[in-house]
């Protein structure tokens, strides 16, 4: 079940909120846990629910055992819990890809191996690992109530696509009564509507542009249309994922929780490094705290720094998907981030205008690598981005103009909303009709678009 569907908006959410606030406050974590598991079952099915339940039980028990144990026993429980978490992620997400590549090398048929990827597994496994690591380090106390832990681990606003929570992000709210607050519900609903608009009005409508490019064939695009498509996909992905994150923040606020922001105007960045401090913030923090720093980070010389960056960005690519284009994407990011750290960082810092041009030129190209899984088709697309480096001529010379007729307003709106000005306007006037009336209109427009069947699944849900 997706947030941008009529059953969620008109059945699940109103019913859940009614039960959540009608029951006595001491039962709200139980309602949150059970309601979240119901939400997940409705969207992902019984098999995926069993995987989630198993990991909840394993990590709840491991947290208590680690906290109560001493010496090597604590480390043993940590390793066992991490093996369950990482092993589950590898089995469901990477085993098929690993066997496929092994089969090519050994001429062996592994086609018998088929396993469905549980919805959101990459997100909730990383959240489980963070919990276990924090308990082991003494940065968090293990939850003593299974229902409280399940409410934290399975909280439906962020379960499928983040933000990736740490217990300390919500611990205070998790252990308080969270009384009904009209102001919190109104504030949360406004955030939800902004996110819904990003998803339904922008991301879902931009999705048809890429479909049109696939229909034409990447090898037959003109260079202008290829660049137009790369920028269009960059906007689509941003408003799809950032829209979900805003909806998650809004829903959590309606329930009495304040969860971390996952995006901070990433397309206003001046470097690839800065972008990744603004995009999917909780994933970046996770890799920093649980991988980059333990590997040595920047504290042990340039070689260790390069090794740490290489491991982090290769695994960042693989986290997004089991395919070679994701590995390549992670390596491309590693190269540019290493260049910024060792070679061009000072230049970018001194030249604001040139640094923005550098970023805006590079990043749409990295999203092309991210999106096209077939490496041959990826080569075709880049041959259209740089036609002077390849054989053949740009064809369909008027194709950009035909697409501009349909998409110019989405590009204009998407670029405007990616700047700081709309956020400043919202913060200044959010209690006035200047904000509420447009939000009301956006909500009804979204309902119309959803009812007419123009929506698409969330892109990051497949990770």
Which residues does each predicted region cover?
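Membrane-embedded transmembrane alpha-helical bundles that form the catalytic cores
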Residues: 1-462
């Amino acid at each position: 079940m997706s947030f941008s569907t009529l059953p969620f908006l008109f059945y699940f959410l109103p019913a859940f909120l009614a039960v959540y606030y009608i029951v006595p406050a001491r039962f709200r974590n139980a309602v949150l846990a059970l309601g979240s598991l119901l939400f997940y079952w409705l969207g992902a099915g019984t098999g995926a629910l069993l995987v989630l339940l198993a990991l909840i039980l394993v990590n709840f028990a491991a947290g208590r055992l680690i906290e109560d144990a001493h010496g090597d026993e604590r480390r043993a429980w940590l390793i066992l819990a991490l093996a369950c978490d990482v092993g589950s992620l590898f089995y469901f997400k990477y085993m098929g890809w690993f066997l496929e590549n092994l089969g090519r090398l050994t001429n062996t048929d592994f086609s018998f191996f088929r396993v469905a990827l549980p919805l959101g597994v990459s997100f909730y496994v990383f959240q489980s690992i963070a919990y276990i690591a924090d308990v082991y380090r003494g940065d968090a106390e293990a939850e003593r109530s299974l229902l409280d832990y399940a409410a934290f681990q399975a909280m439906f606003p962020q379960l499928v696509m983040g933000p990736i929570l740490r217990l300390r992000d919500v611990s205070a709210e998790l252990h308080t009564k969270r009384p009904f607050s009209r102001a919190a519900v109104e504030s949360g609903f406004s955030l939800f509507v902004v996110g819904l608009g990003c998803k339904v009005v922008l991301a879902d409508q931009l999705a048809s542009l890429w479909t049109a490019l696939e229909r034409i064939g990447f090898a037959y695009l003109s260079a202008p249309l290829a660049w137009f498509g790369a920028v269009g996909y960059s906007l689509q992905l941003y408003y799809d994922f950032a829209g979900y994150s805003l909806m998650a923040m809004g829903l959590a606020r309606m329930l009495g929780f304040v969860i971390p922001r996952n995006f901070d105007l990433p397309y206003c960045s001046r470097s690839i490094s800065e972008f990744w401090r603004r995009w999917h913030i909780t994933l970046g923090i996770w890799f920093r705290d649980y991988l980059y720093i333990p590997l040595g980070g920047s504290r042990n010389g340039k070689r260790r720094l390069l090794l740490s960056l290489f491991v982090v960005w290769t695994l960042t690519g693989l986290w997004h998907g089991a395919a070679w284009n994701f590995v390549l994407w992670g390596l491309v990011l590693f190269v540019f981030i290493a260049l910024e750290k060792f070679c061009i960082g000072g230049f970018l810092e001194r030249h604001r205008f040139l640094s923005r041009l550098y970023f805006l030129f590079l990043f749409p190209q990295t999203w092309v690598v991210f999106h096209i899984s077939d490496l041959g088709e990826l080569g075709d697309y880049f041959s259209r981005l740089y036609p002077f480096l390849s054989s053949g001529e740009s064809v369909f010379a008027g194709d950009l103009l035909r697409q501009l007729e349909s998409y110019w307003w989405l590009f204009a709106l998407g670029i405007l909303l990616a700047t700081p000005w709309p956020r400043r306007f919202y913060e200044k006037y959010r209690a006035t009709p200047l904000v509420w009336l447009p939000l009301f209109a956006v909500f009804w427009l979204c309902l119309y678009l959803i009812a007419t069947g123009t929506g698409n699944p969330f892109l990051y849900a497949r990770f």
